[in-house]
């Protein structure tokens, strides 16, 4: 996971025009997976094994899917950890997250909302990392890549 995160943030640092490479403010969309706490720990905690310097998670949007138990049953717990342990600010919309960050990670466990989430991030012209799955369908994934290429 550390290598994939390092690669993602190396790419974000190279392409981000809004932030110095050592001060990237990251936002996370979809706080219903253990990946959000794992990524936040290695970005925000210098004492963490595998710490990746140069970026900090500073903002989040809960998201979640009401029809997937592994989503709705975990989102509040992961959100609380991000707030209490790492001081992450939770916003009520993806647009608010985008206004307060330099780059975004979409982490929602459910791939179905990824296209709608990515549309907002791409429209805000923020570098974007999408965790698996890229989209809910192959057509969604293709559309995400098409939008990102524009």
Protein language model features and the residues they cover:
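Bacterial N-terminal signal peptides that target proteins for export
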Residues: 1-7
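N-terminal glycine-/serine-/threonine-rich beta1-alpha1-beta2 phosphate-ribose binding loop
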Residues: 8, 14, 21-124
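Beta-strand-loop-alpha-helix segment that lines the small-molecule cofactor/substrate pocket
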Residues: 103, 109, 115-150
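Solvent-exposed, flexible loop/coil residues
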Residues: 5, 47, 138
């Amino acid at each position: 996971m550390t290598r994939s995160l390092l690669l993602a943030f190396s790419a974000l640092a190279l392409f981000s025009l809004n932030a110095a490479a050592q001060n990237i403010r990251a936002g996370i969309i979809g706080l219903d997976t253990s990946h959000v706490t794992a990524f936040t720990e290695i970005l925000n905690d210098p004492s963490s094994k595998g710490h990746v310097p140069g970026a900090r998670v500073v903002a989040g949007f809960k998201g979640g899917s009401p029809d997937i138990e592994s989503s709705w049953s975990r989102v509040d717990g992961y959100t609380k950890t991000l707030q209490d342990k790492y001081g992450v600010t939770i916003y009520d919309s993806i647009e608010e997250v985008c206004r307060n960050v330099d780059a975004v990670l979409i982490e929602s466990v459910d791939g179905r909302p990824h296209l709608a989430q990515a549309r907002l991030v791409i429209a805000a012209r923020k570098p974007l990392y999408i965790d698996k799955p890229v989209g809910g369908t192959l057509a969604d994934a293709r559309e995400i890549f098409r939008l990102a290429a524009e």
